[in-house]
């Protein structure tokens, strides 16, 4: 029989204890846990170093309230890792005559990069995308083609550059110069593309805010799939989707959802007739819409965390390019049908148009005021009114000025008497000593200086009265300007109408629909839903 040779690894395996025979740790959870793998221990102690990178660059994680409320035990040494010898003071003295170790001297030397001026070294890091990598023949490409830039280093540099850029606009003068530079850059003619030098512009058009449609709030609605009906396609489907409406609804259990309504055949004919006759709607007609789909929604607006500004452009031939704001972003996902819950597949939306009420017109004027500046004519009228008020109040100021002069003369008399008393005190202090003389003289000078600079109590009261009058005049001018702007808003009423409405009053998922849904809607129509 041939001898059996046992290696060192086999010997060690034979003496190892069987690790998977140990009993698992008893869990403190009553229910059965599907994944019972315990987390590993932290390999090192906390370092208390600020993390300069964005925490959401790899994955967006939101901690729960249970994690936020948990307090981790921080176990540290009593001396915090710093051992101090309080008995022998010579422990921390450094001998200047001691020579460093050669290894330490190399660590203190500055790294000098060798110049890479040779042509061969410049070609090492060159990457040719259209050429096949010869991995089986040579590893030269793999050795020289690897980039030396690490992502952490690149991100750190970008963070540092971001901090330096933010410091540029801290000063007021730098902000003014930066704003003026934008006007100068806008005057320069565009001769070529900013990144493609061979691309030249065919037509240059100015970009302005959309003053016509800015009064209507717009929302971006994103569907998870094509909402077009299955039985139609092409131009007919696009025509139906252009006339579609979305409304917030509630099922029997009280769960809210978004209903997607498409126009019926009769409504499509009425809309086509309105378009041919160049009118928005017929006042007495009723437009019917049938429910097509049900969605759950997720809304983000300006009040939501992580909101990003979004704009869209409108090209008008012969006029220019205009941009408008998308202040709400809505994501719609298909709603699953629940067993035992009656679906609203037979719901019918009946729409009848009306004129806008005062509240809706005020909301439009408020949005319009975001873009428009005050007209110079109104400013001149305000200035004339303020001048008339100042002229009318000048007589009262003169009377108050004469009374303040009388009070000032009385204050001067009292000041002279106080000076005499101070002189008597100075004579008495001369007898007491030289140090007391100097202190009393300083106090007398301080009192006189205070009276000359700040005046008496009567003067301060007159100043307070005059300040109150100035504030009253300023308030009056503000009220006049507000009334003038309101009148202008009523004169410039807009009869434009939008066919979209928003049932999304808040930024959270499945938020409760309240009266704010009508305020957020830009539609000038009344909608009633009936279920068969």
Curated annotation (Swiss-Prot):
Its main location: nucleus. It comes from the Eukaryota. There is a cross-link at residues 133, 154 (Glycyl lysine isopeptide (Lys-Gly) (interchain with G-Cter in SUMO2)). InterPro entries: RNA_pol_II-assoc_Paf1. Residues 375-388, 458-469 have a biased composition (Acidic residues). Pfam families: Paf1 (PF03985). The keyword ATP-binding does not apply. Residues 352-401 form a coiled coil. Residues 1-23, 361-532 are annotated as: Disordered. GO terms for biological process: cellular response to lipopolysaccharide; endodermal cell fate commitment; mRNA 3'-end processing; negative regulation of myeloid cell differentiation; negative regulation of transcription by RNA polymerase II; positive regulation of cell cycle G1/S phase transition; positive regulation of transcription by RNA polymerase II; protein localization to nucleus. Residues 499-508 have a biased composition (Low complexity). Component of the PAF1 complex (PAF1C) which has multiple functions during transcription by RNA polymerase II and is implicated in regulation of development and maintenance of embryonic stem cell pluripotency. PAF1C associates with RNA polymerase II through interaction with POLR2A CTD non-phosphorylated and 'Ser-2'- and 'Ser-5'-phosphorylated forms and is involved in transcriptional elongation, acting both independently and synergistically with TCEA1 and in cooperation with the DSIF complex and HTATSF1. PAF1C is required for transcription of Hox and Wnt target genes. This is RNA polymerase II-associated factor 1 homolog. The gene is PAF1.
